Amino acid sequence: MDNHGILESLLFTAGDEGLDEKQLLEILDISKDQLVELIENYSSHGLIIQRFGTTYVLTTKKEASMYIEQLIEQKSQMKLSQAAMEVLSIIAYNQPLSRSDIELIRSINSDGAVKTLIAKGLVEAKVVNEQRSQQLITTDLFLNVFGISNIEDLPTTEEDDEEMDAFFSNLVNQKGENND
């Protein structure tokens, strides 16, 4: 693989954080001038390499923004299965918790629902307090989708029934069913 391909792979893997110039020079074993030349000659159909200070990030070209916005809009209208909704509510109200905790609560294997929630970006697995198993927590996208600013804004049994009904109506609407 040539240095263009390696550079692209490294920046893709680094994601939004990008890679520092020093890291790239060390990994690619090239000079700063060679790195600048690689970046200037980088060509991809939909991607560019942008520099922010000493950090390089692989980003999409501006010409693709309209299509990316459509994708984001579609994702915001995501539909979830009943099982995924159950698992999501269990995680939201009890986080952090492990997959085995969810199975204990639901009395059924929930791996498929968990994988769906992770793939949709609503849940992520993290190591919390050095526990052996990864713990599942909700993401900022979860908060955004459900219109709350922090997890404490979730309705509780102490809140009035109208607020609870509105929240769960929103859940059902996200799932794609009607209340009729």
From Swiss-Prot:
One of its GO terms (biological process) is chromosome separation. Its main location: cytoplasm. Belongs to the ScpB family. This is Segregation and condensation protein B. The keyword GTP-binding does not apply. Transmembrane segments: none annotated. Participates in chromosomal partition during cell division. May act via the formation of a condensin-like complex containing Smc and ScpA that pull DNA away from mid-cell into both cell halves. Homodimer. Homodimerization may be required to stabilize the binding of ScpA to the Smc head domains. Component of a cohesin-like complex composed of ScpA, ScpB and the Smc homodimer, in which ScpA and ScpB bind to the head domain of Smc. The presence of the three proteins is required for the association of the complex with DNA. It comes from Staphylococcus aureus (strain MRSA252). One of its GO terms (cellular component) is cytoplasm. Keywords: Cell cycle, Cell division, Chromosome partition, Cytoplasm. It is found in: Cytoplasm. The keyword Cell membrane does not apply. Pfam families: SMC_ScpB (PF04079).
